[in-house]
């Protein structure tokens, strides 16, 4: 039986063995995926696999098994490759079948040639995803995943060397600026006993060629959020690629390809003019974007991939499995004290305002659970008004949210940002790629919009479009990507919290006026002491609590539905002027999240009454503030 080092360090040997034992027309490909699926089910086996998120690519062994936790930022056109091909020895006429799956270049021995006219050749199709690390992923998520990796990963899983010779070859071929080389040093690949002149590309022109122009400007890795770091990868998917879509978060396991020969092949192909220019329709920019140097954007040939149900690594990946059900039931049994502690923690963060803390909890566990026509059900955008202007208070509130959720981003709503930032992803037809924007986020990302930063000024056309995009995101939970000739709707599920001085310029589902009970003499010191006072184990319980409750099912019995309807009719009768259908909808939302926050998956009469009470208190505050200001909030 193969040892750990075989399937981790040399997965090609496993694939070759399975391929050799089965005829190409059999289900050898399924046997390969089944083999690795079983291997990864072994105790802690997934943690043995080196992660591109944690280990620099130049420390990873080429053609070894790696994993990558990522978001699909773009999908390129499908490409053709030689799934099976035949080599022939000109001297002995001996023929050998090879597999081309999981490879960028076809392999053949020093005395072999590929028979391009062989009847055994099988041309297949694969899909390429351009993947980036999860935008706005919290530091605690990265640290937790890295701690698992460092604790379990055996020393055989990767080689801590830079493969210096291969890198220098790659460096000469790519001719990228020195700064970029230092940041993204990559490793070369082994030749597998095959001289470079004998190596041929397995890709045909099904949309693009692997060409990397010389002397090109630094490569834009196309991260949605400014200041993001980490690897971008071309992820080659062979099975069930139609089950994935743009913005999905995936965990992929596959074979790492960082072979500098890709640059050789592509440069020679471009310079030798072997291809008819009429047949090569790709622009230089498209070739550069779709076939970047492998040292900068490595390739992963996927053996297994699955879409993540949530972003929190403290929870089991799939909550439907038996072990996961035990985890959930154990946590639910201690839910009440966790909620009480979280409420106390957020109350202190919100300067003693327990009502605002209640609504913040409801906001943080909200999620779009369904869509009725165009209406997203379950969104709960909260506008926290009454925040001090130009204060570090809103910055620290965001830092606290960062410590609680797996992914987040703080958008400072300044005139400068609104007029100059790219919010909406757009299609670049010259490079044939989707250029990312700030609003290209993974599902359940927390977006905190800080309106206290807004000063007087003039929005230009781009600024107006950006404000409109934020409004559409909040109201419809969708972003209209710009495809020049038309707009394409991309549904999303983003938790939006707006912090503002007065009522927000943006729409919201619920406005909560902050009423501080304490004014700390030193706000920074006060906020910092909050986080240092919380034990890491307690913080982890808060994180599990907020992620888990989003995933619970919820229902309202016929009996309670009838009682709610009767109650609403009575409310309208008593106050026909101010009670509207929107009030009913909002109170039902509050009741939903209030029930879930207590671990109850059905609405009770008590929770309905508590929701009405919270709403009455919230409205009374707004009315009080309106009277103080003498105008509409």
Curated annotation (Swiss-Prot):
GO terms for biological process: cell division; DNA-templated DNA replication; sister chromatid cohesion. Its main location: nucleus. Belongs to the MCMBP family. InterPro entries: MCM_complex-bd. This is Mini-chromosome maintenance complex-binding protein. Interacts with the MCM complex: associates with the MCM3-7 complex which lacks MCM2, while it does not interact with the MCM complex when MCM2 is present (MCM2-7 complex). The lineage of its organism: Eukaryota, Metazoa, Chordata, Craniata, Vertebrata. One of its GO terms (molecular function) is chromatin binding. GO terms for cellular component: nucleus. Keywords: Cell cycle, Cell division, DNA replication, Mitosis, Nucleus. The keyword Repeat does not apply. The keyword Transmembrane helix does not apply. Residues 174-184 have a biased composition (Basic and acidic residues). Associated component of the MCM complex that acts as a regulator of DNA replication. Binds to the MCM complex during late S phase and promotes the disassembly of the MCM complex from chromatin, thereby acting as a key regulator of pre-replication complex (pre-RC) unloading from replicated DNA. Can dissociate the MCM complex without addition of ATP; probably acts by destabilizing interactions of each individual subunits of the MCM complex. Required for sister chromatid cohesion. It is found in: Nucleus. Residues 154-198 are annotated as: Disordered. It comes from Gallus gallus.
């Amino acid at each position: 039986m193969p040892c750990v080092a075989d399937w981790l360090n040399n997965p090609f040997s496993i694939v070759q063995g399975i391929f050799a034992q089965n005829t190409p027309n059999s289900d050898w490909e399924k046997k390969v995926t089944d083999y690795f699926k079983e291997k990864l089910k072994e105790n802690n086996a997934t943690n043995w696999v080196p992660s591109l998120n944690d280990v620099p690519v130049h420390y990873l062994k080429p053609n070894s098994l790696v994993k990558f936790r990522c978001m699909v930022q773009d999908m390129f056109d499908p490409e053709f490759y030689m799934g099976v091909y035949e080599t022939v020895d000109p001297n002995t006429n001996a023929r050998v079948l090879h597999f081309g799956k999981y490879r960028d270049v076809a392999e053949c021995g020093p005395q072999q040639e590929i028979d391009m006219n062989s009847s055994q050749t099988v041309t297949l199709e694969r899909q390429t995803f351009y993947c980036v690390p999860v935008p706005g992923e919290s530091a605690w998520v990265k640290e937790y995943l890295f701690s698992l990796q460092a604790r379990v990963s055996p020393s055989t899983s990767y080689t801590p060397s830079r493969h210096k010779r291969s890198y220098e070859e790659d460096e000469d071929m790519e001719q990228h600026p020195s700064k970029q080389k230092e940041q993204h040093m990559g490793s070369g690949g082994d030749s597998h006993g095959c001289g470079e002149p004998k190596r041929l590309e397995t890709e045909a022109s099904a949309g693009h060629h692997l060409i990397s122009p010389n002397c090109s400007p630094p490569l834009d890795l196309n991260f949605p959020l400014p200041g993001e770091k980490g690897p971008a990868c071309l992820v080659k998917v062979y099975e069930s690629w139609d089950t994935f879509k743009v913005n999905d978060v995936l965990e992929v396991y596959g074979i790492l390809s960082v072979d500098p020969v890709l640059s050789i092949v592509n440069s020679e192909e471009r310079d030798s003019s072997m291809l008819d220019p009429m047949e090569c329709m790709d622009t230089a920019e498209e070739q550069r974007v779709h076939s970047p140097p492998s040292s900068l954007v490595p390739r992963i040939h996927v053996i297994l991939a699955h879409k993540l149900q949530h972003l929190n690594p403290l929870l089991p990946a799939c909550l439907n499995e038996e072990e996961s059900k035990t985890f959930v039931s154990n946590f639910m049994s201690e839910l009440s004290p966790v909620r009480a502690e979280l409420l106390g923690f957020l109350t202190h963060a919100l300067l003693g305002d327990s009502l605002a803390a209640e609504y913040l909890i409801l906001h943080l566990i909200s999620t779009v659970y369904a869509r009725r026509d165009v209406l997203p059900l379950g969104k709960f955008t909260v506008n926290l008004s009454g925040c001090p202007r130009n204060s570090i208070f809103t910055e620290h509130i965001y830092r606290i949210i960062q410590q609680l959720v797996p992914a987040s981003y703080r958008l400072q709503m300044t005139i400068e940002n609104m007029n100059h930032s790219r919010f909406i992803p757009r299609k670049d037809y010259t490079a044939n790629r989707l250029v990312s924007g700030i609003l290209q986020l993974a599902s359940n990302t927390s977006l905190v919009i800080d309106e206290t930063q807004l000063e007087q000024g003039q929005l230009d056309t781009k600024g107006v479009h950006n404000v409109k995009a934020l409004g559409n995101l909040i109201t419809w939970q969708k972003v209209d990507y710009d495809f020049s000739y038309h707009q394409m709707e991309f549904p999303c599920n983003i938790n939006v919290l707006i912090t503002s001085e007065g009522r927000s310029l943006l729409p919201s589902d619920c406005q909560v006026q902050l009423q501080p009970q304490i004014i700390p003499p030193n706000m920074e010191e006060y906020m910092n002491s909050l986080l240092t006072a919380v034990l890491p184990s307690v913080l982890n319980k808060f994180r599990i609590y907020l992620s888990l409750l989003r995933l619970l099912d919820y229902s309202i019995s016929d009996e309670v539905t009838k009682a709610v309807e009767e109650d609403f009719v009575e409310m309208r009768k008593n106050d026909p002027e101010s009670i509207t259908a929107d009030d009913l909808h909002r109170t039902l939302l509050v009741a939903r999240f209030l029930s879930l926050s207590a671990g109850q998956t059905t609405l009770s009469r008590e929770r309905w009454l508590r929701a009405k009470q919270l709403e009455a208190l919230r409205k009374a505050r707004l009315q009080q503030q309106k009277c103080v200001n003498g105008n509409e909030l």
